[in-house]
Amino acid sequence: MKNDDSSTVLSTEHKAMQEDLARATRAGGETEKAAWQVTRVLFPHVYREEEFAMPPLLLLPRLARGEVTPDMESILTKTEIMKAELPRMLAEHKAIVTALRKLLQAATAEGHAGFASFAQKLIQHAQMEEEILYPASILVGEYLKLKLGKT
């Protein structure tokens, strides 16, 4: 199974997020401090997302077309890791959202509307991951196990 996740929408979104956050770490004041805290909790989490949450999602278009091939079995390792790591990923989201709320508050107080908007969008992004992407990633594995006759 060949997937190049370097050009996925989610990877592109993560790169843009990192660039915006890097700008916020140079904003000065409480906004800068809050942005650094977001950075500390966010980047290890994003790495794990891109390592085992996102690759299964790349199969969704093929699976939606009814394509299931034996080489897709290789993704099951990642979906099992995702299933095991889900509680940790959700706990990390709580820490990330807490840090983002501090960034939102600081940026608003200091007149950095762009960074405040960025923080709000990231909070919504985390919610979307929890409600849609993480479950979908796990479901890819469960679906493949059924279709490939794996238990």
Regions found by a protein language model. Give the residues of each.
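Small-residue-biased structural context
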Residues: 1-151
